[in-house]
Structures are given as structure tokens and as C-alpha cells.
Amino acid sequence: MRASLPILIAIGVMLSIAMGLRQSLGLFLQPLTRDLAMAVADFTIAIAVQNVAWGLLQPVAGALVNRWGFRPLLVGGAASYVAGLIVLALAQGTAGVVIGAGVLIGMALACTASAMALAVASRAVPSGMRSSVLGMVTAAGSLGSVIAAPLGQYLADSAGWRAGVMGFAILGALMLPAAWLAGRVDRVALPVRSDGQPDITARTALASAFRNRSFVLMAAAYFVCGMQLIFLATHLPSYLAICGMDPMLSAEALAVIAAFNVVGSLFFGWAGGRWSKQLLLGMLYTARSIVLAAYFAFPPTPAGTLVFAACMGFLWLGVGPLISGSVVEMFGLRWQAMIQGIAFMSHQVGSFVGALGGGVLFDLLGSYDLAWKIGVATGLAAGLLQMMFAAPRPPPLGPPCSESPRLDPALSAR
């Protein structure tokens, strides 16, 4: 575990910055659209493109891990992230916003965000510690919003939204050394199959995943998760501004979500090592939908918004260690990044619907009422189905193997 600690710290820092910046982009929705004379739906197109690019490229990045290793993908993703923020800060219209916030940051997230970070953490630690460590890494991933949200709001208020985005680019540059250090996980050899047979191919792993009812249901429910979270991350600042709340309340709410996400991620990482991960997922989706309904059913207040943010934060990214751990239990480590990427692609299609659909419904109806009601209804359905069909832990795909990470002498020179 001592040898893995620098890797875990580095991947936690990288994930924290990547997710913190991404979850705080909604702070710039109102000033950016006013300055560039864009509709809300135009900005949400960029966020929707980001989520689709992220989702479509996630399984590709996961598959390339077995060919190139983690380091080139992590470092390349960090560089793409910084480039995307610079393009966004210099944007003069919709095209620049879509290329910067959409295409470049979407590509970057496929290589720097949760799915890749949790695959690195899974590779770095033994199976007995995996669920708790995944919770810790997920928790670290939420800390970036505690810094990014207030920083972005302060810079936007004092010097304009372009200064806020450029501040994000400077903060994002810290991902580059973190990504390089996290790439040391390439030195850790994969578990050795005890039967001496060759490992399964990518095609066999994918076929097994799509035949597994538990995996298919989990991926479908993940769609709803993405729809709910990105709707909130993108549209909550706009909703509060429309209701006449102080602009800083949006940043405070995002920071509270991030802070309580630390507690929630640690809890669900711990709980996933003791109870059915899929049952916990269903309970999480159901609870999140109830909290969403309770908040949007009444006019917002500062105190109510912060309480909502705390509750939602506890339930925010606890899905990460549960889904990642479920994939390892079902299919093992070798193709974890790719198969988890398939599930995450479903999440990102939901994110596309949440970001774009929320903006379209607002432009058509002048309110978010129908959008949040759809989010609550689909979330309750996903949670109940996930609990109804929760399966016991299956054995990993293929014969048993040693799960303890070990340094591969052939890779020690990296």
C-alpha cells in the first residue's frame, strides 16, 4: 500500500481538479450568454456536446489503456482540458464555446475523470481494500469544487467571466504533473491467472457485459443518474438567479455539494464493501429523487438551498465506487476501464439529455418546472428497478486469479 500512496494522491488531485472545474462551469452561464448574446440553450448545447464526447470516448480510452498504458492518456487529457478552457475564455460566439467547453473538455474528461481515475485506483490496491479506496478517491474528486466554485464566482464578479475561465485554466494546469505521477500505475502488473490460460479478449469481455442482465440494468439506471446531476450542475445557478438569489449562493451551494460529497463518497465506498452494491445504488437513486422533489416543490431560500446542497452532495458521486466495484466484481481488472466506460457512456447520454433538455424546456416554457419533474419521475423509476433486480455478487469473469498488485520488473524503468 505504501508504494501505491503517491499514485493514489496524484490521481486524487487530478480527479479533484477535473471534476471541480467541470461542475463549476454552470457559474458562467448567465454572464457568458449575456455577453455573447447567446440563448441559454446555446450554452447547454456546449455542455451537452461535452458530455456526449466524454461518454463516447470513455470506452475508447479504457480500451487504449491496455495498449498504451495509463500515463499517455492521463497527460494528454490534462493538456486537452487546459486547451479547452483557454479556447472558452477567448470565445467570441457559440462556435468557440462549443469547441472549448464541449469538444476539448469532453475529450479531456474521458482521460482524466472518474472512470479512468477509479480504474487507476483499482489497479493500484489489493482487492480487500478496493471498495474503501475507491470511495476515498471519489471523495477527493469532489474537493476541487470547494476551491473552483468560489474562485470562479469571485473572478467573474470582480473581473468578468473570461477572467474566471482563465483562472480555471491556470488551476487546470496543475493536472499535468499529477497525471504524470499517477501514470506510475503502469508499473503495477495485472493479476496473474491461476490456470495459465490466456486472458480474455476485448470482444469476449464486451459480449459478456451485454449478456449480463445486472450490468445492463445498472448501465440503464446510470443514464438517469447523469441526467439528474448535469441538470443540477448546469441549471441550478441559472434557476437561483431567476429566483432573485444572490449570485454567490450558487457558488456556495456547489461548494457545499462538493464538501458533503466527500462524506457520501467515503460512506458508499465503505458500505459497498459490506452490502450489495446494486441495492445501494437503487437506494441512492431513490433518495436523490426524493430530495430533488422536496427542494423544487417550494420557492428557494438561502437556507433551504444550502440544506438541499448538503443532502444532494451526500448522494452526489457515491455511485462512483459502487459502479466501479460492481464492474470489477463482475468482470475483473483487465478490461475494467473499457467496460466501466460502456456504463459511463450511458451516464453521459443522460447528461446530454439533462443539460440540453433543461435548457430547451426553459426556453420553451420559461421555467424549470417540467424539467425537474421529469428528473424526479425517472429517478424514482430507476431506483426502484435497481433495487428490485439487484443481484448477489457474481464471481469475476474467468478463473480465479491473484488480486494483489505487484510491480512488473519489465515496467520498472517507466
Predicted regions and their residues:
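Hydrophobic core of transmembrane alpha-helices in multi-pass small-molecule transporters
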Residues: 96-112, 304-318
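Extracytoplasmic gate region of multi-pass secondary transporters
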Residues: 25-29, 212-265
